[in-house]
Amino acid sequence: MPIQVLPPQLANQIAAGEVVERPASVVKELVENSLDAGATRIDIDIERGGAKLIRIRDNGCGIKKDELALALARHATSKIASLDDLEAIISLGFRGEALASISSVSRLTLTSRTAEQQEAWQAYAEGRDMNVTVKPAAHPVGTTLEVLDLFYNTPARRKFLRTEKTEFNHIDEIIRRIALARFDVTINLSHNGKIVRQYRAVPEGGQKERRLGAICGTAFLEQALAIEWQHGDLTLRGWVADPNHTTPALAEIQYCYVNGRMMRDRLINHAIRQACEDKLGADQQPAFVLYLEIDPHQVDVNVHPAKHEVRFHQSRLVHDFIYQGVLSVLQQQLETPLPLDDEPQPAPRSIPENRVAAGRNHFAEPAAREPVAPRYTPAPASGSRPAAPWPNAQPGYQKQQGEVYRQLLQTPAPMQKLKAPEPQEPALAANSQSFGRVLTIVHSDCALLERDGNISLLSLPVAERWLRQAQLTPGEAPVCAQPLLIPLRLKVSAEEKSALEKAQSALAELGIDFQSDAQHVTIRAVPLPLRQQNLQILIPELIGYLAKQSVFEPGNIAQWIARNLMSEHAQWSMAQAITLLADVERLCPQLVKTPPGGLLQSVDLHPAIKALKDE
């Protein structure tokens, strides 16, 4: 068969395989188009679970007559025009594929009118070449899209549709998610002529909890803890259910949004789960409705056909920001304010200084130029004081080249109130969970830390060595071996070959796999920490070490390897130090409680402070 260009209808049907999975996919794409058009009211009519009819009507800006035909063409869109726009997407749609794909697998009619036009126009595509016909029609300002007989021309796809009830439940769930994303839009959903959902728009400063309760239920609303956590252009808002009262029914409520776009993102879910892990059982899941706002330049939404996933350029910082925001709310809930004097006074509940964990406490205070203090309040019941107006009708966007991420490493420590003198704890008490907050890098390989007002210096190469030893030491299961693309073949002596054969089982537990013959050994796999090392130097040194040993313990071999690994960083940065200490705290908690020699050294500032005061 010769190479040929596919007919437009066939090409659109192939694209529809990714965009149009079921009727709910059609509803999602069309409602998002309405939101991009600035609609404040959207009416959705469904018949037979969407298989017979999907009708979306909005009061948005409409489409001009001259652009109706283009609206049904592939890769035609008004939302982006250049590569710069693609790298900072602020609209929900941007590819220009949805209408063309939907019209290729259904009978689609598009009717629209702009405020400048005296009459509306209707367009539909038909035939093998998808030729568009435009004719006048009666319609108010806005757009109506009718999708009839979905998959009528692709029987195999139609056969895979579920029951009418199941398909409508999927549509209902999509509308729930969209209604939680846009409190400022009225959304009405009807099925087979009966109104099923009515979500009225919440006015500016109105009660979002009313819609939250209608969608997520009163049980979630009663346990919801409100979050507002901000640093520069990073903002986290929403609600998380109290983990102490989470039920299996509540755990099904997991909604997250990035710049107003509904997401199922593993990084966000992991950060929330990690913040709640101390209070959740092994088989429990947190319940949350969270909104993350981030500079569009720092997130890529063009990584999934249905746009369900995103990729953050600074994923570690986003993860720690979300983790700290959720953790602070949960910690604040457990706190009881202490009276400052004998008279009872109302104590405002403010967020304490973030848990001093490496890489997780740079969000304690907002950036200096934007002094917006994070706050925590339990979600009020309907009728209480108004909440802040979010999410906004139009997503706010400023073209900034990632300054927030540099500011994250320069955030000043929060000011502490003066308290009565208390007995000083050692720099690392037995109940400490963290080395402290990284202030700066000293002499290229030492981190200056602060915890509870105490200053200390930490050797980053030593911490890295302990981390590598923990990563190499086998636990209940052997260390995972990483096959080498090009196996390393080395010549060995009879003594070295004998030592390797005796140590083979111990090396296998460390993830080192090899084969030997008469005078050579071939290294086929090594553990992950060794992949970036110069194995032509390290492996011969390891063989020489083994030849001098009589007992081969995996722990001793792991210790030797860790001490002989070359550091990955000749000059450490703040971000690298933060990442390293976060990993050390997770994998080597014993080092926090009892740091070994050469790792941590306290710095006594009292002589310097005294000298300053005596001047």
UniProtKB/Swiss-Prot annotation:
GO BP annotations listed: mismatch repair; mismatch repair involved in maintenance of fidelity involved in DNA-dependent DNA replication; regulation of DNA recombination
Gene Ontology MF term list: ATP binding; ATP hydrolysis activity; ATP-dependent DNA damage sensor activity; DNA binding; identical protein binding; mismatched DNA binding
Protein name, entry field: DNA mismatch repair protein MutL
Record organism: Escherichia coli (strain K12)
Entry's family note: Belongs to the DNA mismatch repair MutL/HexB family.
Cellular compartments per GO CC: mismatch repair complex; single-stranded DNA-dependent ATP-dependent DNA helicase complex
Start-end of Low complexity biased regions: 364-391
Keywords: ATP-binding, DNA damage, DNA repair, Nucleotide-binding
